[in-house]
Amino acid sequence: FMNHHMDKATEERLRAEAWVGDAILALYVREWILAEEGAINGKLFVEFTSNDFLRRTGNATGVEAEIGRTFKAGGLEAAYAWIEHHLKPRMEERWHTLRRKALR
C-alpha cells in the first residue's frame, strides 16, 4: 500500500489521504462497535484503529490513504465497502478472540 521511494509532493498527498481515511475508519469502527456491543467501548476502538492492527493489512499510512482515496472517488458508501472487504474480517476475528479471552 505504500512505496518508500516517493517524492515530497507524493508523500504529502499520501498523508492528506491518510488523514481523511483515518477519520472515516474511526467513524466506521465506532458504528461497528455500537452495533456489536450495544455500547461505547474505547478499548475496542483503539484496538481496531491502531497502527498495529492496520499493519496486518499493510503499511498503516497506506491503508488509511487507500480508505481516503476510496472515499474521495466514491463517497462514504464506497469507503465503508473497502473497509468491510479489507479490514472487517480481521476485526471480527480479533473481536471473537478478545471475547473468548474475556470469558475465561
Regions found by a protein language model. Give the residues of each.
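RNase III-family endoribonuclease catalytic core
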Residues: F1-R104
